[in-house]
Amino acid sequence: GGGTHHAHYSHGYGFCVFNDLAYTAINLIEENYAKSILILDLDVHQGDGTIDICQNYPSIYTCSIHSESNFPFEKKQGWMDVAIPAGSGDDFYLSQLQKTLENIKHRISPDIVLYDAGVDVFSEDGLGNLEVTREGIIKRDEIVLKHFNTRNIPVATVIGGGYSSDTEELASRHAIIFNV
């Protein structure tokens, strides 16, 4: 599970009670396990709570690629935010991911990446609107893991958002990250 990125410091929000990504990042910094951390959030929704909680930690970098027209409707300003138009599909989404990863590469070299591999970007997801196919999600996860692997930067993953009444299909989408 995990990826409860809407929970703020003082309150839960958007189906999230506490923010596991922010808590993990802060704990790693405060316990001196890492000097710099990237939280890469590819859920369809911006991780507003993560941004809010981590904003006072200059060595925690938040990067969110999300729908520009989906919850939360008032976006926070994180370290790097990429708002994608609804209905963008695989090609545009993956090109924005590639550009963002290159931008990150030229700006920071974190000790670890905490990756929210949300599958609510999927074209048939009940709460998403980016129209990314299953093949697009597979390619996305391959791109992310390869990018950081070639830089010798470890990646810890949470499955993030994904919504469907078909639980087998949803579980299959969430399993993608573990099969690439």
PLM feature spans:
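A general "terminal functional-core" signal
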Residues: 1-180
